[in-house]
Amino acid sequence: MSSRGFTLVEMVLTLIVGSILVLGIAGFVELGTKGYADSVDRQRIQTQAQFVLEKLSREFRHAVPNSFSDSGNCLSFYPIVYSGFYAVEGSDIQFLIGNTNATSPLASGLSLVINPSRQQDLVSDSFDVSGLINDAGYFAVSNQAAILESNSINRRHYIFNANGRVEYCFTAGRISRNGVQVADSVSAASFNYLEPTLQRGGLVHIKLTFTQNDESSHYQQDVQVLNVP
């Protein structure tokens, strides 16, 4: 009984067909791997964008009203430390703090502002309340009522840290908070503060563009400042 081996032509054809199959499988695996990697990158960008928008929204909502200042690629504001109501009694400004965690005496560096209309008011028309003690059921700024520029219709006051201004900036593809990076892969960003009107409070318009691997995702969000003077 005779046996027959492969001819040279059959061997070459087998190698060619095998190589084609291997290349096809490798290309399929590479395509799947690249698709997975791209999906991971997209998910990372989306997660980062959601984190940044949520962080910005929370901080902007609870800022001192009209404490915003936008300049170019930066937006600055003052967070609220305490808030409450006040009354003018003689030459004194007496006030209550609604936050039950407020300490007495008040911490160093705190200032009180009433009815601010711009960020500069927090510097020029505020009252230093550092060290004040709640010894009569309320705090009091003594002998300062005469220099109060304007009153709040709802008798509201806001206490902030005079050295605690927060500034968000977009530079070199990054968004930073007081110099600390909070997001990268940002190709464009803008923060615009719209002053309050009779129909609404102050509004911050956020526009962000994240770019990675030649793919861009655009995000826009309006954040209303919840507090009013």
Model-derived features with residue positions:
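Short linear sequence signals and composition-biased patches located at protein termini or domain-edge surfaces
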Residues: A172-P229
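Extracytoplasmic beta-strand-rich oligomerization domains located immediately C-terminal to a leader/signal peptide
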Residues: R42-F170
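Residue-level marker of positions within ordered structural domains that often coincide
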Residues: E30, R61, Y82, S117, ...
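Acidic surface patches and DE-rich sequence motifs
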Residues: S2, N161, Q212
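A generic short-segment signal for beta-strand/edge and adjacent turn/coil regions
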Residues: L13, L23-I25, R42-A49, N134-A140, ...
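Residue-level preference for short coil/turn positions at secondary-structure junctions
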Residues: R4, S108, R200-G202
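Aromatic-residue hotspot detector
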Residues: F6, H157, Y168, F191-L194
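Aliphatic-rich helix starts adjacent to a transmembrane/signal segment
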Residues: S2-R61
